């Protein structure tokens, strides 16, 4: 049996689509993702492309446009959907999840899910680099 002990993605091209909405959370997730790509995957900075879109609902369309080009080995989607007092959370989180999965299947390109779906700002902060780790970093590791 051959055991792989590391990831060498020096020639990999990775796209990161990130939502602008809730940027105070998303920027920490982005930092975690880039750190993991460069330190653990040896991905060169010039091989990482960051594309910003308005919010999490728009992430699937941005990912689809990138996947359609066929220039990237993987796509990482980053965002934060925080529950409020209306059903808006359920619609945005559900459609974002389904849309990103559809892109991965349709274009046979890995799409790592780094979108937080949380009940509070506190939970988002915990998952963006504090006591619950950094889900952006975890998404990048999944992409690798």
UniProtKB/Swiss-Prot annotation:
Q: Which residues bind 5-amino-6-(D-ribitylamino)uracil?
A: 21, 56-58, 80-82, 113
According to the UniProt entry, what is the EC number of this protein? Answer: 2.5.1.78
Q: Which GO terms describe its biological process?
A: riboflavin biosynthetic process
- The enzyme class is transferase
A UniProt-annotated Pfam family: DMRL_synthase
Query: What superkingdom heads the lineage?
Result: Bacteria
For (2S)-2-hydroxy-3-oxobutyl phosphate, which residues are the binding ones?
85-86, 127
Q: Name one GO cellular component term.
A: cytosol
Active site per database record:
88 (proton donor)
The chemistry this enzyme catalyses reads: (2S)-2-hydroxy-3-oxobutyl phosphate + 5-amino-6-(D-ribitylamino)uracil = 6,7-dimethyl-8-(1-D-ribityl)lumazine + phosphate + 2 H2O + H(+)
The metabolic or biological pathway listed in the UniProt record of this protein is: Cofactor biosynthesis; riboflavin biosynthesis; riboflavin from 2-hydroxy-3-oxobutyl phosphate and 5-amino-6-(D-ribitylamino)uracil: step 1/2
Q: Which residues form a coiled coil?
A: none
Q: Does the keyword Transferase apply?
A: yes
| Signal sequence segment | none
> What keywords does the record list, in alphabetical order?
Riboflavin biosynthesis, Transferase
Q: Does the keyword Transferase apply?
A: yes
MF terms (GO), sorted A to Z? 6,7-dimethyl-8-ribityllumazine synthase activity
Oligomeric state and interaction partners are given as: Forms an icosahedral capsid composed of 60 subunits, arranged as a dodecamer of pentamers.
Q: What does it do?
A: Catalyzes the formation of 6,7-dimethyl-8-ribityllumazine by condensation of 5-amino-6-(D-ribitylamino)uracil with 3,4-dihydroxy-2-butanone 4-phosphate. This is the penultimate step in the biosynthesis of riboflavin.
Family, as annotated: Belongs to the DMRL synthase family.
- What's the name of the protein? 6,7-dimethyl-8-ribityllumazine synthase
UniProt source species = Photobacterium leiognathi
């Amino acid at each position: 049996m051959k055991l792989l002990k590391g990831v060498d993605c020096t020639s990999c091209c990775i796209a990161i689509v990130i939502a602008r909405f809730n940027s105070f959370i998303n920027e920490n997730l982005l930092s975690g993702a880039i750190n993991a790509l460069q330190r653990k995957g040896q991905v060169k900075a010039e091989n990482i492309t960051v594309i910003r879109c308005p919010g999490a609902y728009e992430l699937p369309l941005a990912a689809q446009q990138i996947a359609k080009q066929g220039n990237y080995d993987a796509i990482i989607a980053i965002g934060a959907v925080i529950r409020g007092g209306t059903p808006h959370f359920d619609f945005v989180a559900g459609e974002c999840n389904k849309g990103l999965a559809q892109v991965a299947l349709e274009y046979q390109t890995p799409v790592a899910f780094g979108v937080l779906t949380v009940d509070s700002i506190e939970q988002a902060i915990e998952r963006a680099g504090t006591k619950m780790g950094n889900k952006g970093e975890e998404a990048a590791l999944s992409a690798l």
